[in-house]
């Protein structure tokens, strides 16, 4: 891990561009639940029938004993794996605390384990998120950063988009002086199919505010994330 993190170097002043949030990260969209309660969806029976069709497509006998309950189980698993579509990121960060005794440094929660699903192949990718923010007077409960990560992870994702969404949500709701997010993950769509490279890790990062503008703060964040392994 050390060698890979060292390759994520703090940006030089000449490299930095004016900060802008990608168009797809409109706060009105990514801070609300992705699926509205009144949004039409296929019935559960239709979802189970679709699973049965896929089983038939790969050549399975859908009537054999071991597969009779598989469509139901798969749909139930989807309800769990993709529950983030029905959860609101803004609500997770809504409650803050002002009793900080004048604390003026950044807050870092590292090694937040997560599992998500690649939107290209619908195969899992999993790893750890490291999140820091520098509060302005008020802080959020530490567990909320883990909950926020899970909400976005329990949707179809790319690692790049997941990283950007976490940072943008904290930036938009908490209005901190800066946010830093680093995600390291292994993608099964790369390890068990295609090139089949087991153990290959992907690192993505997103810096805003003081972390984006101050290479020393980026370096300090990366040093603390690297820590003792």
Swiss-Prot record:
Toroid-shaped homodecamer, composed of two pentamers of five dimers. InterPro entries: GTP-CH-I_C/QueF (IPR043133), GTP-CH-I_N (IPR043134), GTP_CycHdrlase_I (IPR001474), GTP_CycHdrlase_I_CS (IPR018234), GTP_CycHdrlase_I_dom (IPR020602). Signal peptide: none annotated. The keyword Ubl conjugation does not apply. Pathway: Cofactor biosynthesis; 7,8-dihydroneopterin triphosphate biosynthesis; 7,8-dihydroneopterin triphosphate from GTP: step 1/1. Belongs to the GTP cyclohydrolase I family. Residues 12-24 have a biased composition (Basic and acidic residues). One of its GO terms (molecular function) is GTP cyclohydrolase I activity. Keywords: GTP-binding, Hydrolase, Metal-binding, Nucleotide-binding, One-carbon metabolism, Zinc. It catalyses: GTP + H2O = 7,8-dihydroneopterin 3'-triphosphate + formate + H(+). Residues 1-25 are annotated as: Disordered. Its EC number is 3.5.4.16. This is GTP cyclohydrolase 1. Zn(2+) binds at residues 118, 121, 189. Gene3D superfamilies: 1.10.286.10, 3.30.1130.10. One of its GO terms (cellular component) is cytoplasm. GO terms for biological process: one-carbon metabolic process; tetrahydrobiopterin biosynthetic process; tetrahydrofolate biosynthetic process.
């Amino acid at each position: 891990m050390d060698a890979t993190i060292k390759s994520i170097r703090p940006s030089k002043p000449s490299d930095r561009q004016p900060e802008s949030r990608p168009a797809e990260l409109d706060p009105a969209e990514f801070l609300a639940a992705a699926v509205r309660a009144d949004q039409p969806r296929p019935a559960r029976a239709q979802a189970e029938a679709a699973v049965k069709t896929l089983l038939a497509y790969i050549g399975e006998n859908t009537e054999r004993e071991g597969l009779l309950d598989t469509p139901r189980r798969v749909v139930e698993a989807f309800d769990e794996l993709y529950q983030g579509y029905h959860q609101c990121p803004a609500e997770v960060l809504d409650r803050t605390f002002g009793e900080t005794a004048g604390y003026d440094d950044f807050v870092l929660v590292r090694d937040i384990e997560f599992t998500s699903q690649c939107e290209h192949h619908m195969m899992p990718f999993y790893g750890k998120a490291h999140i820091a923010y520098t509060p302005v007077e008020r802080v959020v409960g530490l567990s909320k950063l883990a909950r926020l990560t899970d909400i976005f992870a329990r949707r179809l994702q790319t690692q790049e988009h997941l990283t950007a969404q976490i940072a943008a949500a904290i930036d938009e709701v908490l209005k901190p002086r800066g946010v830093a997010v680093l995600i390291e993950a292994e993608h099964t769509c790369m390890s068990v199919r295609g090139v089949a490279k087991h153990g290959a890790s992907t690192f993505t990062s997103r810096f805003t505010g003081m972390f984006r503008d101050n290479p020393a703060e980026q370096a300090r964040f990366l040093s603390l994330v690297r820590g003792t392994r």
